Structure formats: C-alpha cells, structure tokens
Amino acid sequence: MVRRIGVLMGGLSAEREVSLRSGRAVCAALESRGYEVVPIDVNRDVARTVRETGIELAFIALHGPLGEDGAVQGLLEVLGIPYTGSGVLASALAMDKIATKKILAHAGLPVPEYRELEAGDADSARAVVAELGLPVVVKAPTQGSSIGVYIVEREEDLEARITDAVAYGGTRVLVEKFIAGPELTAAVLGNREPRVLPLIEIVSATGKYDYESKYTPGLSDHLIPPRVPREVQERVSDLALRAYRALGCRGFARVDLIVSGNEAFILEINTIPGLTDVSLFPDAARAAGMSFPDLVEHLVRLAQER
C-alpha cells in the first residue's frame, strides 16, 4: 500500500501561484488521512528531487506548461513512479486548445467555430472577422486559468490581442466565435468507467470568468444545479463523458462548456483542475457527497489502478 506521496506543485508556468494553493490543500488532505507527504516545489531539478525523496506515488498539482502538458508525466513514466491524472498523450493534447478542438470535432462533438492564426498575419486576421463575425475570443492555445484570453469586440483591436496572446509563448493563437450563454463545467472522475459529478453553472460578478474571478473569493458563484433545463444538463453530461474518452483522459478532468438555447458547445478540457478553496472540482465533489480529503484519496486510488 502506498504511504509516501510526493505532491508536485508550483512549477515554472504562469499558473505557479494557483498550483501552490492547490498543492498545499492536497498536502493537508493527505496528511489528514495519515499519508507521509513530501511537498515538492517543481523546478528544473525535479528529476533529481523526485529520485532523492523516494516517493512511492506522485500527486500532480501542477497547472499550465511543464506540468499539465505531459512533460512531468513523461518524466514520472521514465522513473517508474505512478501519478495522478491523465497520461502523457492526453495531457499534451488537452493542454493545446487547438489540438483539442481538432480531436473533438473529428469525434463529432460540438465546439464553437474557430480559426487557427499565426501572429503577424494581418490578412488572415481580417478574414477571420469576416467569417466568424464579432465579437470573437482570442486565446493563447497552451495556457490555462483564463491566462492569455481576450474578448475582442472591435476589428481594430484584433491584431493587438493576437500579439498579447502570442506573448505567452509560440506563434499560433486560437480565434473562436463568441457564444453568449451560461457557462457550465462538468467534473469527470474515473479511469475505465468515468462518471460525471453534479454540474456547475459559473456566474461571475464581473461578467467574465477571468483569472481574478476564478481565484478571488466572492467574485464568482458556483450554482448547483445549473439554471438550464434538465434535458440540457443531460446533454452536457453526455458531451463531457464523450470528450473525456475522446482524449483518453484518466483519473479526473474538468470539461468546460457554453450553452446557447438547447445546444451546448465544448470549450476546453482541463486535465489537472484547480484544487484550491475556490475551485470548481472540489465543489462538484462535495455536491456528490465527497469531502475534499475523500476526493484526494480517491484520486490516489485511481492512480494506483494505472
């Protein structure tokens, strides 16, 4: 039985502070259940650190590039250490919003209409506005926590927002048709037989669910159940499960969707959802009757089934 668990947190991405909050919460939960916990603030010496600590299992509480994108997962595979969450391929695919959309669309799942643009291609940017209309959403394709996400309402602002998004790395951006409607999130839990926990509707006090709204208490409400018809909720749960399976996720993931009328569109998949005191996945687990320590321990058990 696994007793010595390393909690990998912090890391090198723009989501470092959120990851530290998730990691500390996980450490406390594991300690409350009697595990020997080794907090590991991930840096470029992580391979040596993991070997020297002698951990039996890694609980990955990292967010963003070099943590959620398959890099650390691959390292742990090489070291022969079991870990929580999805494997290398699913992690890498879900971290890239453009790759995710291509896979979901190929699987016949609904996604907002989108285009992939290279920075500096002004002609293509103008063509996108003509094709998608305004407003559009510009996204840095390999960031999370709404980092590098901009709603563009005027054509003259598009190139500047593309430049802003590219500043987070790479040369590509995702430009997505803006869809107005309630935003729902589906927490999916499990390996071969995953299940969807109670759905959550996200209501932001500022009108947009950005980084500040996500991680500042009081700036967003998590409504359970969502204020959409039962048949829409069932549709959202089904889409979330199908998306989870299409990418080959394991352990847990959070699928974000937008609802327009009776239709739902998948926005993205988060393979390491936030585990802070204001995060969505723990709220969904609580609504399903799982305390936070219950959830964390269940993720450890799922990791051992790999």
UniProtKB/Swiss-Prot annotation:
Gene3D superfamilies recorded: 3.40.50.20, ATP-grasp fold, A domain, ATP-grasp fold, B domain
Residue ranges occupied by any ATP-grasp domain in the UniProt entry: 101-301
UniProt key word Cell wall biogenesis/degradation: yes
A Pfam match: Dala_Dala_lig_C
Enzyme Commission code: 6.3.2.4
Cofactor or coenzyme needed: Mg(2+); Mn(2+)
Main location: cytoplasm
Residues that, per the record, bind Mg(2+) 2: E268, N270
Annotated GO CC locations: cytoplasm
Catalytic activity: 2 D-alanine + ATP = D-alanyl-D-alanine + ADP + phosphate + H(+)
Ranges in a coiled coil: none
Metabolic or biological pathway, per its Swiss-Prot or TrEMBL entry: Cell wall biogenesis; peptidoglycan biosynthesis
Any GO molecular function: ATP binding
Annotated positions binding ATP: 129-185
Gene Ontology terms: biological process: cell wall organization; peptidoglycan biosynthetic process; regulation of cell shape
Residues holding Mg(2+) 1: D256, E268
Function: Cell wall formation.
HAMAP family in the record: Dala_Dala_lig (MF_00047)
Name of the protein in its database record: D-alanine--D-alanine ligase
Lineage summary: Bacteria, Bacillati, Bacillota, Clostridia, Thermoanaerobacterales
Gene (UniProt): ddl
